[in-house]
Amino acid sequence: MGRRAFLLLLFFLMLTAALPASASGWRSLPLWGGDVRSLAIHPDDPDMVFAGTSAGQLYLSRDAGRSWSDAGAHLPFPGWVVGTLRFDPNKAGRLWVGLWGIWGGGQVAFSDDLGKSWVSRVSGLPEEPIYTMALVPGRAGRIYVGTLSGVWGTEDSGESWRRLTGELPDAQKVTSLLVDANQPDTVLAGTWRRAYRSDDGGRTWTGIFEGMVLDSEVFSLTPVPGRPGEIWATTCGWVYRSPDLGGKWERFKEGFEERRTPSFSALPDGRLLAGTVAGLHVSTDGGLTWKRTGDPALSIQGIYWHPKRPERIYLATEGSGVWVSSDSAATFRPSSDGMTNTRVSALASFGEELMVALSHAGPVSGIHISRDRGKTFEAAGFTPLPTVLDLTWHEGRIYAATERGLYERRGAAWFRLNELGETRVEQVLGEGPQLVARTATGLWELRGTKFVQRPFQHGTPRSAAFFGGALWVTDGSGLYRLTATSNDTVATPFAGGRLHRLQDQLLLWGPGGAWTRPALETEWIELTDKASRLLPTGHERWSSLMVSGDTVRLYDRDSRKFRIVDVPVPARDISAALVLGGKLMLGTSGHGVLVHDLGEELFPASAAPAPVAAGTGG
């Protein structure tokens, strides 16, 4: 089977086999948000909005973004980024989607039932990402898509495709397309290096370079309402205006506080909006000057409004969900209730508090606290922090290892510890009076009230665990047992592994599988030969989650076995695990926090448990 055939088969399996998370007993904690890469407003209903995410979800709002739910299957496009959503101007109710794959490749499909089902249209397209799409009003069946190799077109709604820019080797990575509303045979293509135009439906092309810097990647092309021929291009270096469909460009940047500008919109009242990776910028003088407005932590991927409701403006943001303005961009509010496309980097429970660390979420990145085991998360319980990589409790205090330093919680506030500065701290672990922080370059330990560097005369530490009265540490080539008086090298079944303590056993996991070493033993015992990850759950009985390929297993101390768990998302997306109040919680990268009651229904009846070596506490 060729790669194209394989991708097609995989795509159709995704469309038919995806099930809602609730169908298998899983539900989501109410931490709303998403990495929203595209929006589409229904042409006939300004309150109906679709949102596509970087994790393959498609959400639908019927109340102008106040609430969201799955448009169809819970995860219709796993492994794909929903980069483009377009309603067909020639086919009422038809919604088109353009996808690009995390592992490569792309897809084009349409839905005639508001996202409940999809029909693939890729015959003749290369196995490349679909970065953008343009449909042509008055030209039924004509569609353009931008790919890595240029512009491809169809005249029969995707039944067949042909490359339109084959004679232009520089017209690569087409990330934006625009069809002139007054001249449907005129199409502009923005590429990784400036833009091109065709005036004959894509048969021939001309570079439209005058006034534009050579290395300008053109992210978007936007017309100005009521001003034929005037368009704006956003690039990696501010914005450009052309009065004549790209015949000549002029760059504008005065007032911008960030140059990289993925999105743009020209409002009917004459104001211009430019969405940068560091907030929204507004111009009231035709683009001569700009001023940032709103939260600078928002990375804005798209700006949308409906002609019937131009005062209502939607922002699609990277990691921060959807933001909506009801007053013509004077103010914006987050509006993502029901979206679970959040990235969870850590889970922990301390006393009555459940802590969930969200990352890459703009202004809501940090630690969210629930005092009712995840039923609600209060705004007062949120603390913005750099990406949290680990959480631990030590002698009455909570510590957070982050991408920019080690933090300690004092009361309701968090404080960065000065000794480590802004270095990346990947792990923090305690045992009795000992507290150790592992950074990207070394080890630190708490002595008295200060952290000091602990000698480690090996490579960059990759993992650490307290076990048997010693600190065990791996680097890229070996395993070492450290005590106050010794520094011993320990043989391992493979190099480059990571450590995890499982009661009275030490587990080694990584590309060489998962192995266990019981206390007082010197031999490693293989659990699986598949590349694996182990995640602690903080629970005495159900103490560890093992991810091996597409298989997820939960360790049961009573039976001393790993039991297979059915999960509703790709196993690779699981980033953290916690058992709390009789429930298994999974933190994910792109699907929020998933929760399932512990019980036999969690485990498929046909799956045989995997045993672990017996130990006294095993």
What kind of feature is each model-predicted range?
Residues 9-15, 20-618:
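Extracellular glycan-interacting surfaces
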Residues 1-8:
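Bacterial N-terminal signal peptides that target proteins for export
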